[in-house]
Amino acid sequence: MDLSRINTWKSKQLKSFLSSKDAFKADINGHSVLYYAIADNNVRLVCTLLNAGALKNLLDNEFPLHQAATLEDTKIVKILLFSGMDDSQFDDKGNTALYYAVDSGNMQTVKLFVKKNWRLMFYGKTGWKTSFYHAVMLNDVSIVSYFLSEIPSPFDLAILLSCIHTTIKNGHVDMMILLLDYMTSTNTNSLLFIPDIKLAIDNKDIEMLQALFKYDINIYSVNLENVLLDDAEIAKMIIEKHVEYKSDSYTKDLDDVKNNKLDEIISKNEELRLMYVNCVRKNY
């Protein structure tokens, strides 16, 4: 039987069908009647099916809450949650319903889940399958910004650093700024601990580097000799930051600033020495 047109059935036909023993079995397409009701965003039919026992007869391959999370309207999600569906359940792909709300960009549905349980954004069978990381990967600044606003206390720094690494790799400047601003405002124990800049340097992503260099970024975390000799614009940015660190009373005595090969590299190259001198003059 094909149930794909059940949304057009008359009430008498629907009532007769729901009283049959096959009411909640899969049709020829492998779907249940509830699947089609949700797909059509038919709130009334969904309520009828729930009252008839649809949630007690779910197919193994169907996840109504996950499906409803892809809809722009939040009504069916609210109904399913009120009916007792588990918002932390993983589907057969290892994702939560919130993951699909994020995937669809449905901010109102995202808010609905997070207000109920903010920890859902970090639920996933792996760290890469969480709703938070998925929003970062999608470069959805609005959703990530909302997520950050709903976290009551700073979360795992390793997760945050991994997300920042991803934004640098993908060249997502606005997302990187959002995450770095959050990190610097909530983490006070890691001066010059911002993720390494190698990815941005390798990609010659000047826009990303310009954004990164506004923070206390660790310019000493990679081998900079080839960089300094290969790209004049990036070399100038690195030297300017180095001079800034050496002249700042807060950073000049840090081991990373004092014990590095940057000054030696600069001293051996006339062009780099000139850049350095100009930077020093500009700082005084």
Swiss-Prot record:
A single Gene Ontology biological process assigned to it is: symbiont-mediated suppression of host NF-kappaB cascade
Compartments reported by the entry = Host cytoplasm; Host nucleus
Q: Which UniProt keywords apply?
A: ANK repeat, Early protein, Host cytoplasm, Host nucleus, Host-virus interaction, Inhibition of host innate immune response by virus, Inhibition of host NF-kappa-B by virus, Repeat, Viral immunoevasion
Which gene is this protein's source?
OPG039
Q: Name one Pfam family in it.
A: Ank_2
**What are the start and end residues of each ANK repeat?**
29-58, 60-89, 93-122, 127-157, 159-188, 192-221
Top-rank taxon, per record: Viruses
What's the protein called, per UniProt?
Answer: Interferon antagonist OPG039
The UniProt entry, under PROSITE patterns, shows: ANK_REP_REGION, ANK_REPEAT
Q: Which family does it belong to?
A: Belongs to the orthopoxvirus OPG039 family.
Q: What induces it?
A: Expressed in the early phase of the viral replicative cycle.
Q: What does this protein do?
A: Inhibits antiviral activity induced by type I interferons. Does not block signal transduction of IFN, but is important to counter the host antiviral state induced by a pre-treatment with IFN. Plays a role in the inhibition of host NF-kappa-B activation by preventing the acetylation of the RELA/p65 subunit of NF-kappaB.
